[in-house]
Amino acid sequence: MQGTKIRLLAGSLLMLASAGYVQADALQPDPAWQQGTLANGLQWQVLATPQRPSDRIEVRLQVNTGSLTESTQQSGFSHAIPRIALTQSGGLDAAQARSLWQQGFDPKRPMPPVIVSYDSTLYSLSLPNNRNDLLKEALTYLANVSGKLTITPETVNHALSSEDMVATWPADTKEGWWRYRLKGSALLGHDPAEPLKQPVDAAKIQAFYEKWYTPDAMTLIVVGNIDARSVAEQINKTFGTLKGKRETPAPVPTLSPLRAESVSIMTDAVRQDRLSIMWDTPWQPIRESAALLRYWQADLAREALFWHIQQELTKNNAKDIGLGFDCRVLFLRAQCAINIESPNDKLNTNLSLVANELAKVRDKGLSEEEFTALVAQKNLELQKLFATYARTDTDILTGQRMRSLQNQVVDIAPEQYQKLRQNFLNSLTVDMLNQNLRQQLSQEMALILLQPQGEPEFNMKALKATWDEIMVPATAAAVEADEAHPEVTETPAAQ
């Protein structure tokens, strides 16, 4: 789904955005992933993982439709259809269907059976390993969901009277920060959690289902210790009979650029004040090697920035401050934030501490020693690449693949990744990294304060004044310098 966070953790290695380096060559997909398109347009991708024989078999069916395809009178249709699906046996007998859902749930990593968002609906099953019978039943069930649902007044009423097991992304579509972020976007009027309008017309839900649940708008993913060839044959046999074709393209979800404002938002999502220094840029797909320089340089610069600030706060024995950093792609907007967890009465002081470090890095850059230590750490991670890959379970591999598809990233093989990443690290210099940091830190940034419900609203003008006093004069100078040297004005894509 959209909005997946990427946290910078010691020793982590992001396999998601693998890409080539230097020449602008098209990237070659990892051949370990078998993939194809059926005659009816359904796309499938299968990864056999013999290195993980005990892992569960992960199955995902993504339908490219969500609440954004609904008209006002159709509100709630995209949420109602999977509710109906979950109350039907999907071409199995009732006992088989019950058994499938009981066993198709990973107790260690519980995941909703269906997640509905603005532009997609994701059906998920996690099956015990070595159960080819269950995998066959899962494919039968999902094929039935894809084009053979029984939608009548009786089945609709039965679904609505049953427990709602369908989740939304985001989980709370009415949360204050999320509603703020959607300002200026068509998404605001298309809530995937919206209930059906009364009275319910089953015939209209059926028409919506037939229009948007077409095989040419579906992607099926299977990952696990399986016989990939046999599974591909099962997919062709089970899903090949589905009918229908999209006659109307689905609307493309878009977000407005993040406004460089200072705002306070009351929310149940936090228990302590969280101030986010936030910026965003258009996300650039990674399909060819020229994208590597932009992505990897920007990504490594952000990681270096985070570790620098954290080390400086530790060195100065800073109290009552928690620091976090996350980046995510939201509908092809790449958004990053430095998050400051702080008591209410120390917000201004803690913002000042962080802003001063940001200004120092922007104006003076990282030291040669910091750069050398960072590259050494990245080289160490690279040496452990294959061990890391071997420890990556099927659930993680599946999630990474879903994100790659969502964000238009070509996954390459670990062997190629290792070679290209090594070349990248060998070619990187402290000056290249510092120029990237200057570019990123010279952007206008938003100050977003999330406060627990019931807390007195904080004076954001005071925070903005603190920020401007430290950051703005040099930012303005940097912008003027960039205008004089247009060859360095492009800000690399963030993730």
Swiss-Prot record:
Main localisation: periplasm
Family per similarity comment: Belongs to the peptidase M16 family.
Gene label: yhjJ
Organism: Salmonella typhi
Record's protein name: Protein YhjJ
Protein location: Periplasm
Signal peptide boundaries: 1-24
Domain of life, per lineage: Bacteria
GO molecular function terms noted in the UniProt entry: metal ion binding; metallopeptidase activity
Lineage: Bacteria, Pseudomonadati, Pseudomonadota, Gammaproteobacteria, Enterobacterales
Gene Ontology CC: periplasmic space
Any further remark recorded for this protein: Has lost the active site residues.
GO biological process: proteolysis
Pfam families reported for this sequence: Peptidase_M16 (PF00675), Peptidase_M16_C (PF05193)
Xref: InterPro entries: Metalloenz_LuxS/M16 (IPR011249), Pept_M16_N (IPR011765), Peptidase_M16 (IPR050626), Peptidase_M16_C (IPR007863)
Keyword field: Hydrolase, Metalloprotease, Periplasm, Protease, Signal, Zinc
